[in-house]
Amino acid sequence: MASVIGIGAALYDILMTVGQYPTEDTKLRAEQTKFQCGGPCATGLVAISKLGESAAYLGTVGDDMFGASVKSELEKYHVDTTHVAVKPGMNGHSVVIINTDNSSRTCVWNRGDAAEPGPEDVTEETLAGAKYLHVDGNHLDCAIAAAKLAKKMGITVSMDAGGAYPNIENLLPLVDVLIPSEEFAKKVTGCATTQEAAAELERRYHPQILVITQGSKGGFIWENGKEVRYPVFPVHAIDSNGAGDTFHGAFVAARLKGMTVAESCRFASATSALKCTRFGAQQGIPGYEEVLEFLNTHEGVIVHE
């Protein structure tokens, strides 16, 4: 069985690169077009698999070309799809515009109308053998049911907290490893500063591990009431799409390999940086040995706010 079971978004991305962001109501020729799969949970699982740990996706896909591609891509990267059900309707998909001039990305997405997985899709059998349950806040009812069962089974629950979806606060108390973006942390808590938000998340939800991500600034571990910053690795970024999702998957993979929280953040930061040097949210994710080689030849930088 897989070491990590994931429940959350698995999307089909149409990726287009441009030399400048288009002005509204104009036409602009793309430099490149690529078709790929994405979504926070799915991309995190691909990262885990590419880094040498076993992963499985529990969810649904549409019976359209988007859904077929999502399932096929997961299987290509050795993510188990035994518990993926094909449902009538359109799979979630997005158009991602990447500005190669400044490496920004703009995403327009459609959730699709294929039925989502529900609590009834989660059983002890589906979670058996897992060490981690990885969620991203999508398919919330299913994720909550799975997290409750995971707690009973001694499975660690990790969360890529990027979207402050309605009723997300019902999932947060069940999370052991909480890694939100600073935007999520501030929005959920209503705090003015990221540090205040971290303290409030800890007070409310008591995660065992709390790491706040801050994009190009890196981020910090919130430990004993203070921040411990982790390094970033400056690179020539050409595609940041999926970088955050890669960080989350790499963090879980590092923990499975026995790394400390600080070591896991450093490893995840390096993995994310390498991903940014190539196109593709999932295709661009490096392998384990490549990350180790990168760490041996590159010094990280601590960015202070």
Range-by-range predicted roles:
Residues 73-88:
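A glycine-rich helix N-cap at a beta->alpha junction
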Residues 1-60, 65-69, 76, 237, ...:
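Glycine-rich phosphate/adenosyl-contacting loop at the front of the ribokinase-like
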Residues 114-123, 141, 159-167:
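Active-site glycine-rich loop that binds ribose-phosphate moieties when present
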Residues 84-86, 96-132, 137:
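Conserved phosphate-binding/catalytic loop of the ribokinase/pfkB sugar-kinase fold
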Residues 1-5, 195-305:
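Conserved phosphate-binding/catalytic region of the ribokinase-like
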Residues 147, 151-158, 162-229:
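Conserved phosphate/ATP/ADP-binding segment of small-molecule kinases
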